[in-house]
Amino acid sequence: MKVQFIGATHEVTGSCTLLEVSGRYYLVDCGMEQGEDIFQNVPLPVPANAIEAVFLTHAHIDHSGMLPKLCKDGFRGQIYATEATCNLCRIMLMDSAHIQESEAQWRTRKAERAGERAVEPVYDTNDAAAALRLLRPCQYNAAVQAAEGIIIRMTDIGHLLGSAAIEMWLTEGKQTRKIVFSGDVGNVNQPLLRNPQPVAETEYLVIESTYGDRLHPKERGDVVGELAACIQRALDRGGNLVIPAFSVGRTQEMLYAIREIKQRGLVTGHDHFPVYVDSPLAVEATGIFLQCDPADFDDETRAILKQGVNPIWFDGLKLAVSSDESKIINTDPQPKVILSASGMCEAGRIRHHLKHNLWRRENIILFVGYQAEGSLGWKLENGAKSVKLFGEDIAVNAEIAMLHGTSGHADKEGLLAWLAGFREKPKMVFVNHGDDSSCKAFCATLKSMGYRADAPYSGTEYDLITGKLTTYTEGVKIDRAAAFKGTQRARQIYEDMVAAAEALLALVKTRRGNTNKDNAKLTGQIVSLIEKWKK
């Protein structure tokens, strides 16, 4: 009976842990690495078709995003997750597959022009559909016999709708051991979500450490009050408030806050001000939030629902799905609030909104989530005077603001508070899902408190029956900075190309009634361009 650490070891993304019980193999999470990769991960030591089941803590792509690849490689077992996680995966994995296909198509066209081989996507929509067919919904707090010798129970961990810590009872022969995987531990007092629920006991614990070396500000901001002030300021100036927000989770939290702002009349002089959600994925996710089991929400949200009030819907909310609906937003002169993805401004429709709004002094760009170093959002937060969008240099004249108190992860104190919920200290605590410094710092904190703890690197294996290491690995650093920058650059170029094509189509639609000579000339130029790049 062994546990082997594969991904999110001394890193924040790519969560994946392998369990071996009675010669059978199981995964906890199967996530995609995102952003810069610091340490090399060992490959799965067994083929995908040898994996009998996957246990999924939540739907975020860094925990679920390689499930379609696992299916592509031969996995045919079941994927256990809460019902809300299953519902979110249905949209998030398909969205991820579309991204993989689009990037592969763009790279293939580039490769073929250079006489090179076509680029295959990491996975496609068929692979994502195959993964979705394997989902097995579980209820919170219900013991499930997932396989011979495997019993699981999922406990709400308060990070995202449907997120769970997973308790596992593993039996091999006459020996039973219990291990708990924390998943991502949520912050307390977040909109919509319950606080992380405690787990009573375990022998072994795998715990995240995203913020294991730091504390959130003691004085957490009044999110609703600060957001209302930003809206008031922007609308009073005749400007827009643009909020880059992650499609799933953060967008819905912002809608919850704006609903309260409108209900309490905290913005004055701008009755029925419009709020646009401009992200197809966010629109789908909002639908899932609206349809989920009310028991998944916190007490405050359930009380609102009992009053017949929709907690994330209000007068003036407008959803933009098509590209035409998105474009109309920036042609409408009425002051407004715009929520769009991606949250770090690296891709998606938010880049169009930044292009149209950054240069205007009356506008506000409000960041409500973490901005990774080097991202466009990070550059704006850190005082960039000009940024390049779609091949143009855009002056940053808009006010840049940050909304505090919105983190979805527990800080060091929050992690320790959740850990204190165990009646007795676990025999061993494994620290993962944090960058190198955070992982090491949180592990050191635990040791100073009397815990037996380790922060394993990828490939480290531990025998749960004997309580001893069977394989010990050191972290192997790899130079992926250049490759990461190249990937980000390629994605930005692709986004710029799509935007240019949309602008060309918009131009064509304005030329009805122009002279035949001019229209024929433009048509010829477009056809020539197409023929040139088809080669």
Question: What do these predicted regions represent?
Answer:
Residues 30-31, 176-182, 187-188, 209-218, ...:
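Acidic/glycine-enriched edge-of-secondary-structure segments
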Residues 228-376, 388, 423, 438-440, ...:
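Hard-cation-handling environments
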Residues 349-352, 407-423:
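A short, acidic, amphipathic alpha-helical segment used as a generic capping/interface helix at domain edges
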